[in-house]
Amino acid sequence: MNYLVMISFALLLMTGVESVRDAYIAKPHNCVYECARNEYCNDLCTKNGAKSGYCQWVGKYGNGCWCKELPDNVPIRVPGKCHR
């Protein structure tokens, strides 16, 4: 029984687990992508692997693109300054 658990755990680690999150997609230097239209953000987000995206009006970082189910390998806006 222990061997079965260990083999299952090893297979899980070998295949990897990719998680997703909802967040503002970030440009280099921790800046959001400014927006005016939902279509722009949806295109940007889906091209980067997200399920969808929209323009978050007057949000925490102004008018920025918010992505739903964005992969972990894509940078997101984190607390702190945008260094343009």
UniProtKB/Swiss-Prot annotation:
Tissue specificity field: Expressed by the venom gland.
Every LCN-type CS-alpha/beta domain range: 21-83
Protein name according to UniProt: Toxin BmKaTx16
Record's subcellular location: Secreted
Chief location: secreted
Top-level taxon of the source organism: Eukaryota
Lineage: Eukaryota, Metazoa, Ecdysozoa, Arthropoda, Chelicerata
SMART domains referenced in this protein's UniProt entry, alphabetically: Knot1 (SM00505)
Family in the record: Belongs to the long (4 C-C) scorpion toxin superfamily. Sodium channel inhibitor family. Alpha subfamily.
GO biological process, one term: defense response
Disulfide bond positions: C31-C82, C35-C55, C41-C65, C45-C67
Signal peptide limits: 1-19
UniProt key word Cell membrane: no
Record Pfam families: Toxin_3
Comment on protein domains: Has the structural arrangement of an alpha-helix connected to antiparallel beta-sheets by disulfide bonds (CS-alpha/beta).
GO annotations of cellular component type: extracellular region
Cited function: Alpha toxins bind voltage-independently at site-3 of sodium channels (Nav) and inhibit the inactivation of the activated channels, thereby blocking neuronal transmission.
Organism for this UniProt entry: Olivierus martensii
Keyword terms: Disulfide bond, Ion channel impairing toxin, Neurotoxin, Secreted, Signal, Toxin, Voltage-gated sodium channel impairing toxin
Keyword Acetylation carried by entry: no
